[in-house]
């Protein structure tokens, strides 16, 4: 959008990226990643010949949907009338056909706030994020919920057992050269995001 504001030739590209945002939001929210019981997004493992398996391990991956937030200011719509018209058509089409539409809030006609996460799910994700026995630590946000310290995640896939446990220091296994980065420590780059 920023480029399109300065060069109208990119208006079609901005529209395409907006449509892709909507389709990604639909995939995240409508295709088995959200768990209503745990109120969290999980990875979904698809194995040929089997039903998709939701990997109910609370990792920072389930929080990354919070990163995709954007505000579209009224002045952008004013400078890009075709973009505004296409977005309006796309929204009407999806709503008319009962298709997913991402969390969108408008403030007095001035700006549009877009988020991959619907408001009601956002509240639950923030509860996980800000809970000291889950993701929040003195040093930042953990990569794996501290919940898994006493409750390791176990899954059996094709007869092989796998376990993931909160392990924020030196790894207790030799996998990946003893690297435990996915098992609880704080990663500054992700905390910055």
Question: What is each PLM-predicted segment?
Answer:
Residues 1-193:
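Acidic, mature catalytic/reactive cores of soluble proteins
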